Amino acid sequence: MNTSCLVTGGSGFIGQHLLANLSRHGYSPVVLMRRISEFPMLCQRVTELGGNARMLSAVQGDLSQPGLGLDTAAQRQVAACATLFHLGVQFAWGLSLAQARTVNVEGALRVARLALRNDARLLMVGGYMLCNAQHLARVGVRARQPELTDWPAVYRRVGGYEGSKLEAHYRVHAEMSLGGGALTVVHPATLCGHTQTGHMLPGQPFAELARQLSERRLRAIPGSSQHWLPLISVDFLVELIRLAAFDPQMIGQSLLALDARTPNLHGLVQALAQVLQVRPPQRHVPMAVLKALLALPGLPNLLQVEPESLDFIQRERFDLSQTNAFLQRHKRDWPAIEQAIGASARYLKATFYAAS
């Protein structure tokens, strides 16, 4: 069996845990890195996460460059990879259409073309919003005929980051279908930390919610008692990604990685506040009111809330029958999401918010 695989976005939160998981299970990940000088530091992080850094290697490349910026030697090394994991994105709020498309859309297409050229299987990480048909219709995505979607209008409605993730999904599907490639997509919910250690990186939406609570900036809970922020622990997500990538039955399929037992947003805030030892808000602010306030100049900075982030807070529930069948086939059970939430809050408090 060919154990070599290419990983984009390996330096990110999911990427670090995926490299640890793959290397721990005998795979040999090749990491695409813009700054290859940071590879030793990445190896150290992978070791700390329980991986085998000796299984890792790196090639210099860039998602924003033609041909991924690979030189001849790197192309030969990548050509030996039977599986490509595409996690690399530019994540930031307030991205322009051009900024978001450069890496998140064009970069994804470059990875897809590399997979087709090398006859490699592609595992792409999408997002759970792509599994919400009502949301897609609301923001103007023509899911059945995506080529007819007015993408600039979608970007204006949901922001550059989410717009580019949506567009990349449909563009890559079309590219792989046209070329007869093997594609599997995993759609993760919002990430919380490792189930046991709580490890996570700052800047994640879950971590930002904890930060707002820790700094006592969260005065009211967005939405209503029906709203929730669907979660998945990072360790279980990367386990699902690895299993899906090497499952022949998952070629041409997608997998929703979302824990339906995630508490509603009120319950999540209460659980975080208990660990952080702060008084949680009890009142709700209607989503429409909050979005209207955030449309006022200067309010997002004052409240430290990004308007784009509100779309991830949902009322809709999701069909997990395919996911549960996948787990049953692989003899896996959902880990306790309450444990992951508590461990994540403790890790964030000890690592980043101790002085708050």
Language-model region placement:
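Glycine/proline-rich active-site loop of Rossmann-fold NAD(P)-dependent oxidoreductases
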Residues: 179, 194-207, 244-255
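Active-site Tyr-X1-5-Lys
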Residues: 154-184
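Terminal hydrophobic/aromatic helix or amphipathic segment near a protein terminus
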Residues: 265-317, 334-338, 353-356
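Amphipathic terminal alpha-helices
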Residues: 318-356
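A conserved pocket-lining segment of Rossmann-fold NAD(P)-dependent short-chain dehydrogenase/reductase
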Residues: 152-156, 208-236, 240-244
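NAD(P)H-binding glycine-rich loop region in Rossmannoid oxidoreductase-like domains
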Residues: 51-56, 60-106, 114
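N-terminal Rossmann NAD(P)H-binding glycine-rich loop of SDR-like oxidoreductase domains
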Residues: 5-27
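Conserved Rossmann-fold NAD(P)-dependent oxidoreductase catalytic core, especially the SDR/UDP-sugar
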Residues: 83-86, 106-160
